[in-house]
Curated annotation (Swiss-Prot):
Function: The inner membrane transporter component of an inducible organic solvent efflux pump. Involved in export of toluene and styrene but not of m-xylene, propylbenzene or ethylbenzene. Is not involved in antibiotic or AMP efflux.
Keywords from the UniProt entry: Cell inner membrane, Cell membrane, Membrane, Transmembrane, Transmembrane helix, Transport
Cellular localization per UniProt: Cell inner membrane
Membrane topology type: Multi-pass membrane protein
Name by which UniProt lists this protein: Toluene efflux pump membrane transporter TtgE
GO cellular component, one term: plasma membrane
Family note: Belongs to the resistance-nodulation-cell division (RND) (TC 2.A.6) family.
Provenance organism: Pseudomonas putida (strain DOT-T1E)
Record keyword Lipid metabolism present: no
Pfam families, per database record: ACR_tran (PF00873)
Main subcellular location: membrane
UniProt-listed InterPro entries: AcrB_DN_DC_subdom, Acrflvin-R, MdtF-like
Gene3D superfamilies per record: Multidrug efflux transporter AcrB pore domain, Multidrug efflux transporter AcrB pore domain like, Multidrug efflux transporter AcrB TolC docking domain, DN and DC subdomains, Multidrug efflux transporter AcrB transmembrane domain
Taxonomy of the source species: Bacteria, Pseudomonadati, Pseudomonadota, Gammaproteobacteria, Pseudomonadales
Keyword Phosphoprotein among record annotations: no
Length: 1046
């Protein structure tokens, strides 16, 4: 094949140009994201039961739904939480590869079976089923620069005008409103109700009867008799729109004809539906809409669509109201992609310089450089067919591929140059002879490197998604690289290279002359060194065994993790106030946190948004959240200016805040996989020990974790039990007084909860009508005595006649995991420890907890456990596949063994470099390790291919063949290894977005290449000689027999 294109160079150019054009066209159409869909698909079921406690919601809603969630395809696990505000959320997580749309449909079908068993009030509220991601990908908000609108006004504006169009955008999965829409609020006075002998149920019934939309039909509607001349729509009663209309609702007509209307029983106002959450942006009242990405959504495209929609809506906002973006993850994505693009450009330049240093000819250097755009662009034409998008993982793979793909071209060019210099051949003749010598080696290298990565593409879970991005991209690049080296590069060599004049290679002056003389001297020393090693094989085999054993030991010392930490320019701070603390107290702490961040860290922090009434541990007046966005990475280059350092200083300062627990934390590397980096686990009550026992086990766990040096910031992702006032109804007394239990329940729901009645129309939108007691009637336990229920005789009976109350302790938030009562705990490894170390410590702590308390990991931690279990299989399978490919290629068992023996030498350097930089054995390290395995094997193949040729075909004695092959291939091995190492070096020294993952990949690769090159060139001849002697002792070829006689 190579000869065909050597004789037809224009044909080769045409193919290269077509490949580049196809890639450029594909590049403009490929989606761009920071990561592929690494997070497992999940579906969320959301329900509200107004006025219900967390326990009530768990018993009457959560468990009913859980019992129906069986038989779902690809089901992995489910987690549920219920809160004291009546809200409930069940998150069902599926295996990677499950279609999120089908998963959502299946969950909805199962939910239909559970719906008839749910409380009527829950059914009336409706159930939401949405595709779900854990973290917000952005928060959009509104502020009023005039100061006229409160956060509740702004919340209504978002709910009325922005929420629907934004939530319909493709890619938006779920949302959380930091604010609330308006509702028609009817505040009932219990004294007035009692004086008119009415109950909240009477008011609700009157509203339902009079606030209705009546479908009245038509005049002259068909069928009718002939001669009818009129057809008109009959308009009946419509829903009310203003507080004044609701005030006039007739509740009761007395015997004397006097009327009791709603306005006689309390106040009617247009007010917020929910007062629990309020927000501030840079100290101003604001409201926000937190958006979660839909499973499978494209983050950049979704952010672009959201901002475009908001630009359209700006024209319809009141004067002075501005759109803000207090939290946006898209700059992280863009910065990560830009960083890798710069890395690729740096890699190309460095590779070019290394090649020029060795080839010392601009013509010879340009040839392998031209291979880079051809292969990379052609790869983009093929990637979409494998479901691969443009993301940081494919770009990292491209960086690795640059060093790999120029290797093949360098091997061709260097061998052609050698033949021209050593044998005086013309470029055309040298190219033809060269391709006859090295075509097998090129195919072998391509097969080996492909074999290294192919097994990675078939692993499951989130790690499998990461492996696949690298595997597919590198295998495509390697395959194209081999084709370019067999088609395009020979054509360029035959037409671009010039024959040397008077052995010019050895007569160069200046720097290149010095370099060549130095390299030749060192080559001679190297040749003598290889000869010495082959004379003392036993000694050096022992050294190799020690290196291998040391590598195994050092490997066990690397801390384990799933993904490295990243500076994404984002930080969150949770505020947890004491039990039963008011929203006013929480606001004071939120302001203190905000002031510290904007004043003490003002040079690094761009802006903050505070949210009162909500954090990831739950909702409530004692909860708060601060969203922090740091300045651009270019403005934070100095030591101590990264987000982890900012969070560390912030936590040291927040520890001094009295009467509050304030914790700053950083999002995980993959934002869709959690809210905070570290570990995420559930303690489960496997034996049904009860809530008190579970909480006691949780507290014991937290105490033991606080004493463990490898753990820090271990905290419950929930709420402690708090004082609750329990009302006990004496059914016997109630029946004796002829009071209906249903009337009692209705009165309690309306008085202290918030009873949803029906809907009204506000500015053309449907909103809700609620009745509730005035604030003075629901402040203290004594206020229960203010409420009355009407019995069957029409008499008003006070609550105190049939009800008593007492203070108890109960949880404002209950959790379940896998259908079992559980508590969620988050934490981080202490400085100097990894998440793998933390998990070992957790396992030790679990042994001290009571029997019946189980442990399950969630989110990123679940993936880390799963990845750790897969890693040994990945290593073993990779080595096995490489061995089998080489055996098939060379029709020999000895050659593959010689190649495989070199692998520990590369791993040795990778492990040393990773330990030296204090990095962890994460998924990226494993990718780097597999790359090192392939490159180590490649160097071995280059030597063994020549030694095999000399020994088996030319009859050169075995030892001489090994020494000669090592001498001949030393220069290309050093050149290709340096080219690859310098190509990866920009990743090893990267800063800014995505630097953690780049360091993790490149550090191991650079360290592995150094040892794989420095040690392998000495040990590969030894391995080849020893293996041939062992495997072919009985064959006794002529050269081997001659050598033994000598």
């Amino acid at each position: 094949m190579s000869r065909f294109f050597i004789d037809r160079p224009i044909f080769a150019w045409v193919l290269a140009i077509i490949a580049m054009l196809a890639g450029a066209l594909s590049l403009t159409k490929m989606p761009i994201s920071q990561y592929p869909n690494i997070a497992a698909p999940a579906v969320s079921i959301q329900v509200v039961y107004p006025g219900a406690s967390a326990k009530t919601v768990q018993d009457t809603v959560v468990q009913v739904i859980e019992q129906q969630l069986n038989g779902l395809d690809g089901f992995r696990y489910m987690a549920a939480e219920s809160a004291s505000d009546g809200s409930m959320n069940i998150i069902v997580t599926f295996e990677q590869g499950t279609n999120p749309d089908i998963a959502q449909v299946q969950v909805q079908n199962k939910l239909q079976l559970a719906t008839p068993r749910l409380p009527e009030e829950v059914q009336r509220q409706g159930l939401r089923v949405v595709k779900y991601q854990m973290n917000f990908f952005m928060v959009v908000g509104l502020v009023d620069k005039t100061g006229k609108m409160t956060n509740f006004d702004l919340g209504n504006l978002i709910a009325s005008q922005l929420q629907d169009p934004i939530s319909r955008i493709n890619g938006v999965g779920d949302f959380l409103l930091f604010g609330s829409p308006y509702a028609m609020r009817i505040w009932l006075d219990p004294g007035k109700l009692n004086s008119y002998q009415l109950t909240p149920g009477d008011v609700a019934q009157a509203i339902r009867e009079q606030n209705v939309q009546v479908s009245s039909g038509q005049l002259g509607g068909l069928p009718t008799r002939s001669g009818v001349q009129l057809n008109a729509t009959v308009v009946g009663k419509t829903r009310m729109t203003t507080p004044a209309e609701f005030e006039e609702i007739l509740v009761k007509v007395k015997a004397d004809g006097s009327q009791v209307r709603v306005k006689d029983l309390g106040r009617v106002v247009l007010a917020s539906e929910n007062f629990a959450i309020s927000a501030k942006y840079r100290g101003q009242d604001s409201a926000g809409l937190g958006l979660r990405l839909a499973s499978g959504g494209n983050l950049l495209e979704t952010v672009k669509a959201v901002k475009a929609e908001l630009e359209k809506q700006k024209a319809y906002l009141p004067e002075g109201v501005e759109v803000i973006y207090p939290y946006d993850t898209s700059p992280v994505v863009e910065a990560s992609i830009d960083s890798v693009v710069h890395t690729i450009l740096e890699a190309v330049v460095l590779v070019f310089l290394v090649m020029f240093l060795f080839l010392q000819s601009l013509r010879a250097t340009i040839i392998p450089t031209l291979a880079v755009p051809v292969v990379l662009l052609a790869a983009f034409a093929l990637l979409p067919y494998f479901g691969i998008s443009i993301n940081v993982l494919t770009m990292y793979a491209m960086v690795l591929a640059i060093g790999l793909l120029v290797d093949d071209a360098i091997v061709v060019v260097e061998n052609v140059e050698r033949l021209m210099h050593d044998e005086g051949l013309s470029p055309l003749e040298a190219t033809r002879k060269s391709m006859g010598q090295i075509s097998g080696a090129l195919v072998g290298i391509g097969m080996v490197l492909s074999a290294v990565f192919v097994p990675m593409a078939f692993f499951g879970g989130s790690a499998g998604i990461i492996y696949k991005q690298f595997a597919v991209t590198i295998v495509i690049c390697m395959s194209l690289s081999v084709l370019v080296a067999l088609i395009f590069t020979p054509a360029l060599c035959a037409t671009i290279l010039k024959a040397p004049e008077n052995d010019a290679h050895h007569e160069k002056k200046g720097f290149f002359g010095w370099f060549n003389r130095s390299f030749d001297r060192n080559s001679a020393r190297f040749e003598r060194g290889v000869g010495g090693i082959l004379k003392h094989r036993g000694r050096y085999l022992l050294i190799f065994a020690l290196i291998t054993a040391g590598t195994g030991y050092l490997f066990t010392q690397i801390p384990k993790a799933f993904l490295p930490s990243e500076d994404q320019g984002l930080m969150m701070t949770e505020v947890r106030m004491p039990l039963n603390a008011s929203a006013e107290r929480t606001e004071v702490v939120l302001q203190e946190v905000k002031d510290y961040l904007l004043k003490e860290e003002g040079q690094l922090v761009d802006h903050v948004m505070t949210v009162n009434g909500f954090n990831f541990a739950g909702r409530g007046q004692n909860s708060g959240l601060v969203l922090v966005v740091l300045k651009d990475w270019a403005a934070r280059q100095a030591a101590g200016e990264d987000v982890l350092s900012v969070a560390e200083r912030a936590n040291a300062r927040f520890a001094r805040i009295k009467d509050a627990t304030v914790m700053a934390f950083v999002p995980p590397a993959v934002l869709e996989m959690g809210n905070a980096m570290g570990f995420d686990l559930y303690l489960q009550d496997n034996l049904g020990l009860g809530h008190e026992s579970l909480m006691a086990a949780r507290n014991q766990f937290l105490e033991l974790a606080a004493e463990n040096p490898s753990l820090r910031a271990v905290r419950p992702n929930g709420k402690d039990d708090e004082p609750q006032f329990q009302v006990k109804i004496d059914d016997e007394k109630a029946r004796a007084l002829q009071v209906s239990i249903a009337s009692i329940n209705d009165t309690m729901s309306a008085a202290w909860g918030s009873m949803y009645v029906n809907d009204f129309i506000d500015l053309g939108r449907v909103k809700r009508v609620y009745i509730q007691g005035v604030d003075s009637s629901r402040i203290a336990p004594e206020d229960f005595d203010k409420w009355y229920v009407r019995n069957a005789l029409g008499e008003m009976v006070p609550f105190s006649a049939f009800a008593t109350g007492e203070w108890i302790h109960g949880s404002p938030k209950l959790e379940r995991y896998g259908g079992i009562s559980a508590v969620n705990i988050l934490g981080e490894p202490a400085p100097g420890f990894s998440t793998g170390d933390a998990m070992i410590a957790i396992a030790q702590i679990m042994q001290q907890l009571p029997s019946g308390i189980g442990l399950s990991y969630n989110g990123l931690s679940y993936e880390e456990i799963r990845t750790g279990d897969q890693a040994p299989m990945l290593y073993a399978l990779t080595v096995l596949i490489v061995f089998l490919c080489l055996a098939a290629l060379y029709e020999s068992w000895s050659v593959p063994m010689s190649v495989i023996l070199v692998v520990p030498l590369g791993i040795f350097g990778a492990v040393l470099a990773t330990l030296w930089r204090g990095l962890e054995a994460d998924v990226y390290f494993q990718v780097g390790l597999m790359t090192t395995v392939g490159l180590s094997a490649k160097n071995a193949i280059l030597i063994i291919e020549f030694a095999k040729e000399l020994y088996e075909k030319e009859g050169v004695p075995l030892v001489k063949a090994a020494i000669e092959a090592a001498r001949l291939r030393l220069r290309p091995i050093i050149m290709t290894s340096l080219a690859f190492t310098f190509g990866v070096l920009p990743m090893a020294r990267a800063t800014g977005a995505g630097a953690g993952s780049q360091h993790s990949i490149a550090t191991g690769v650079v360290g592995g290449m150094i040892t794989a090159t420095v040690l392998a060139v000495f040990f590969v001849p030894l391995f080849y000689v020893v293996v041939v002697k062992v495997f072919e002792r009985n064959k006794k070829p002529a050269a081997l027999a001659e050598e033994e006689l000598a």
